[in-house]
Amino acid sequence: MDQDWSRWLDEVPEEGESSGRAARSKAPVVRLRKRRGDSGEDAPAQRPILVVGGCGGAGTTTTALGIAGEIGAAGSQTVAVDATFAGSDLALRGADEHLSPISLQSWLYGRGDDEAAPLKECLSLATSGIGLLWRDPAPLRRRATYLTVSRAIDEAGYTPVYDGGSPIAGRHLRPLLEDADIALVLAIPARADAANRLRVTLEWLDDQFGGQGDGQGGGIVGDTTIVISHQLPGNDSRIADHLREHLDGWVREINEIPYDPHLARGELVRHSNLAAETRRAYRRLLAGVAS
């Protein structure tokens, strides 16, 4: 990949500086996942989504919950999946209706002989209508990977939204990153230092998963959506505008999630209690990565 795109990292937006939203060319959708409908014909389905952090404190869990909540609100069977290395607080933050004692591992091996138990019976639940799968610290066994998890969820008829946490380079995430059906959302907090670390992350993605012929807006980098999460009051968009100016055409899209007092509490998230502006931001994000 031509490295000219990374020169912006030597610059820092000045106080009061704000570039307008440039017209952006979108990277093509890589593939459409098919799901058999009531008519018996295959129809395009919502793409699975993997949310990972460009650094710690990026808001991957709340972003995954917000996206999943909006997919669920549209009527799709959706499950938010803990795809971190040793377990996160995904279910503790999102299961405002029912917290199941069944972990991802218990579901995955529930019937023995490498056959998963019925997914619906094992899910934690949110009042938004989505299910949640939390994982315990134990490693996946019997050579299972998150590709195994992905296939089992797809067979159950659910759309997964994975909370991958950080760092993105974790080996357990590779099967999901290698699957071009899965849309990648890269989240960072609205801080200059977090924006500057994107260079390392995007270069790593290109080195590990990019193709030799990938040009501007192509490959995994071109199919990546960057999300800037505002975790302090205010609507300062200088970081987002700066990234749009310098990454225009290189990534799929750059979106912002506004500050929301309900999310800032760090407690149980009830989707219906999110501000209208926050939910609109999740819908815009979802529209950008949807099939």
Role assignments for model-derived ranges:
Residues M1-G56, L99, Y109:
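Extreme N-terminal, non-catalytic leader segments
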Residues V51-V52, V81, L133-D136, V161-G164, ...:
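Conserved beta-strand segments of the P-loop GTPase G domain that flank and frequently precede/overlap
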